[in-house]
């Protein structure tokens, strides 16, 4: 080079930023590059060899991955506005930076269900959520990426995402639900008032079927000696219950004066059934009761002249009209 003033320009690599300039007093070991990649006004005199024009770079680590862990109370796989976050879920981030450095870090979801990994380098990562207690993963990919659950129910892991050094990922979420139960009591409504009176007995052996929103039978149960029945370990969702009413019983009167003691069944399309029951995550509804009362009976027959005295209606023996018949208690 001829003696003169020079500028040196460095190309800043992807994923890096310029290091702090001229730190310390030793010009041989510091960085001279400015934020735009230039070292300016280098003066060379005749015969000079300058070996201290240096450029230092540091990896940009300003990326973020995180979002939300929530309880999917209705089991639809969507973050509805009323559904709460879950605290204490273990979340693990694994992956590799663009330089090939492996990453494996963990955190715990906060009280509002949020979690996050900040100051990440550019790279490819995935997130794994670990279930605790009775939580189960909800169905993934049920709606847009901002509102769905991204965790594979079998592994707890999300898909891999590749991010730049400044990218902010706020859409890797995990939804959980817990199992629930519904049921209660079948009784003989002796006074037919539609309410469970303390002296009225239970009815054993009544078959009840749990029907899901698709119209399929999920499970069945028979009322026990105490009239109790229960459907347990249920997924959140909408259900109805159908009852097989014996011919010697009918549904009792509908009475809504006390919802804790009334009967919840009515005739729906010819079947004894409840209205739709919304079952939410981690709920117990022991208030679905069935009241039955004795069916009305009838007595009928023939009055005839048994001319031959054989006790059998024989052809030719006349019927008797206008005879008064009494029904007596015994």
PLM features per residue range, with description:
Residues 1-69, 73-112, 116-226, 231-329:
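Acidic Ser/Thr-enriched surface turn/capping motif at secondary-structure junctions
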């Amino acid at each position: 080079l001829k003696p003169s003033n020079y500028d040196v320009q460095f190309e800043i690599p992807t994923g890096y930023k310029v290091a702090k300039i001229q730190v310390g007093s030793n010009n041989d070991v510091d960085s001279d590059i400015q934020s735009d990649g230039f070292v300016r006004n280098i003066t060379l005199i005749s015969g000079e060899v300058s070996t201290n024009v240096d450029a230092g770079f540091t990896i940009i680590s300003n990326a973020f991955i995180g979002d939300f862990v929530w309880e999917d109370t209705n089991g639809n796989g969507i973050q509805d506005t009323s559904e709460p976050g879950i605290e204490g879920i273990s979340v693990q981030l694994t992956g590799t930076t663009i330089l090939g450095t492996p990453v494996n870090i963990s955190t715990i979801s906060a009280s509002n269900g949020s979690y996050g990994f900040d100051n990440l380098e550019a790279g490819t990562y995935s997130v794994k959520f670990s279930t605790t207690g009775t939580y189960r993963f909800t169905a993934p990919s049920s709606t847009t990426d901002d509102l769905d659950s991204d965790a594979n129910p079998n592994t707890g892991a999300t898909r891999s995402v590749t991010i730049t050094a400044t990218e902010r990922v706020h859409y890797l979420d995990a939804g959980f639900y817990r199992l629930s139960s519904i049921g209660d009591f079948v009784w003989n409504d002796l006074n037919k008032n539609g309410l469970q009176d303390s002296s009225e007995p239970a009815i054993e052996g009544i078959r009840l079927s749990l029907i899901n929103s698709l119209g399929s039978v999920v499970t069945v149960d028979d009322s026990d000696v105490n009239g109790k029945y229960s459907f347990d370990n249920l997924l959140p969702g909408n259900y109805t219950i159908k009852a097989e009413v014996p011919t010697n019983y009918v549904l009792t009167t509908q009475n809504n004066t006390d919802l804790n003691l009334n009967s919840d069944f009515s005739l729906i399309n010819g079947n004894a059934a409840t209205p739709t029951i919304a079952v939410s995550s981690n709920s117990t509804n022991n208030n679905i009761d069935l009241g039955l009362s004795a069916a009305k009976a009838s007595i009928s027959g023939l009055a005839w002249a048994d001319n031959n005295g054989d006790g059998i209606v024989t052809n030719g023996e006349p019927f008797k009209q206008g005879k008064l018949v009494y029904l007596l208690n015994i």
